[in-house]
Amino acid sequence: MRNSLIIALVFLLSMTCHAQKISMLDLVGKTWVADSGYDGCGNIDWNIVFSAKSSEHKFVGKSDNKVNVFTYNTYLCSYSPEKYEASLLGNTYGKYIVFERKYTYKGKEYEDFFCGEILSLESNRLTIRMKHSTILFIAK
């Protein structure tokens, strides 16, 4: 019985450690530069600057220096949502980061979202697991 209680206590403590919540304030005020793990990292530089409710994503072609800048509505969430939830815009705590994309490409308007799990955040390192990759960002 005593061993069962100890195992249960260890399990609960480990769950608490894994339930790390990130604050949007930890992301704001820095330029996060994608270092590795994303599609096109050999061809494109990717930087993100966060504000309380949005994020600016800057993509620069390494061969032609072509710049594309997109601003996405952004919020943090405690769970991985199935769709973008506008009512959560402004939510500043959570383990998942959600981006709403609205953009025009070749004259046609598009809208979708993507979500990533924040695996770790240190003062100058951010690791996000996206659908098909794990991306490391370095703060500059």
Label each residue range with its predicted role.
Residues G29-F59:
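Start-of-domain marker
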Residues G37-C41, K58-S123:
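Contiguous, well-ordered beta-strand patches that form the walls/edges
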Residues M15-I22, F137:
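Bacterial Sec-dependent signal peptides at the C-terminal "C-region" and cleavage site
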